[in-house]
Amino acid sequence: MYTLTQFGFREMMDCRTRIRAIFNDDPATLAEAGERVVKFFYEGLLDDTGKPACALVRMFKTHRFSDLDPQSRAVALRALPDAETVPDLRCLTLLATAGDQPEWNQVANSRAHRVIPLPTEAMVERAPMIAQLITQLGGKISNVLRPDPNLLFDTKDATYNLFYVPRAVGSPFIVSQKEFVEAYRIASVLGFGGLLASGDFFAAILFSHIPITSQVADLFKVVGMNLKVAFLPLARRPLFKA
């Protein structure tokens, strides 16, 4: 466990090692892998009193609409009724969630973020946080909506491995200010992830009660890169149990 206000180089090195080992016991599904990740960060990052430093930790991954399980497909269709007509539609899918509120600990309880269809760049740009998350972690929105295998390992991708909102209050990237940021005392937001060999995009997002300094955020670039390395072999696992 790590006290977030005291997270330094030593803690980063230890966290990096633990992240690389998080999937040693092979997860059967992407959801199981995501559950390990959100639990690791929610339970492992603490404030100065020993309580969870994060109000909420979530993990997302893009998935082809045609490859979604029936329940997830139904959720996508409610959000985008003509989803079946969009060629090779990608959906940002909530793999796992852990947080302070009981309803934040079950994917099925998520109303707005369980499955988010991403039909066009214009529609993605209307969701500021998703657009910024993709831009910071995936390089270009077009790379996520229409993956090009020739670009997946572009060296530029290595620089887009951190999404950082130092002050959540008033941030244009977090639209739900009163209902979420103010109500649950969100101070900073940190995200890491990127593009996988499958062409899919993934991200772990931490909504912290305590301010995260730029120095601490920089250390999580290494943590995020190691999470990506650990997650790479799992990219083609089934989303959920059949």
Region locations from a protein language model:
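Short, charged/polar micro-motifs that form catalytic or ligand-binding hotspots
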Residues: 20-28, 167, 180, 184, ...
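Helix-to-coil/beta transition segments that act as allosteric "coupling" elements at the rims
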Residues: 121, 127-146, 152-200
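Intrinsically disordered, low-complexity terminal regulatory regions
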Residues: 1-157, 209-242
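Sensory beta-strand/linker motifs that couple input domains to effectors
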Residues: 198-208
